[in-house]
Amino acid sequence: MNDRIALRRLDDMHCHFRVGSLLKEVLPFTAQYAGRGIAMPNTRPRAILTGEDVVWYRDEIKRALDEISHQHPFEPLMTIEIRDSTTPQMITEAYRAGAVAGKVYPLGVTTNSDEGLRDFDSETISESFRAMRDAGMLLLIHGELDRERTLVTKREEVFLPTLLMLAEKFPDLKIVLEHVSTRVAVESVRQLGKNVAATITAHHLCLTLNDVVGYGIQPHHGCMPMPKDFDDRDTLVAVATSGDPKFFLGSDTAPHLREKKECAKGECGVYTAPVLPQVLAEVFEEVGCLDRLGDFTSRFGAEFYGLPPNDGTISLTKSEWIVPEQI
């Protein structure tokens, strides 16, 4: 790696900004290097389900931005959560309120998915997906299914037939398989049409299941989908650094209070926002593909979403530093 590199300001296509005081604490880390960030809708106590919710959450984020000192503009890209009760009218109203995408959490697979989608093929949901297609909204999917006698490490693979069904049924709907974690998911996205893409996180480029449970329980590495085998991680690194435009950054940065992680039943999520560009630069440098980092972080996601490139750049300097243990 050169002592200094410049990147166009990032597009982080998967961010958990939270609400309230935690929002104000974590938002500055992403805003310092990103021009845009997709705001995930599975917030609590108020989930983002309607156009009214979109307006409320965007205003919350912008108020938090107004309270921090940042030199460059940051745009939150809003989403709604798609549930079995979501209707085409709700889709239309959310789009008019500024939502660029709808996010599906299958029932019970991750944080705050207790009211997640049960039936991907119901007529009501199909009508909602058609409304998203007609409006130009994207469908973002947490691609796991919790089935009887299915290990947590197999949930993503079990979901892939559903992805295939959706891609074939809605060829004009842009679909993003979020935070892919397995070789088979990467292969599936590559084989499907140009309407299907995937995000990759920094932590899935670095961790395996051993880093979660192999050397004692390490709760701050626990997330959904779980990191998998070495072959899966190697595949993710290879495709992220390959220059394939179907794969781009979505950090899934997910902050939790420390006591919510270090407990008998800890929350899932890895908080990477404070170190995201640095970790990605190390990964790309290790495989000799630092020249492709900007495409992964700042080009391919924008192109898939139909957005112009961000203005401005950030600079990374190669030097030793100590990551704070907590913020």
Per-region residue spans from a language model:
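Short helix-capping segments at alpha-helix termini
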Residues: 63-73, 168-170, 193-194, 289
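Histidine/acidic residue-rich metal-binding segments in metalloenzymes
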Residues: 90-104, 113-249
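His/Asp/Glu-enriched, well-ordered alpha-helical/loop segment
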Residues: 242-309
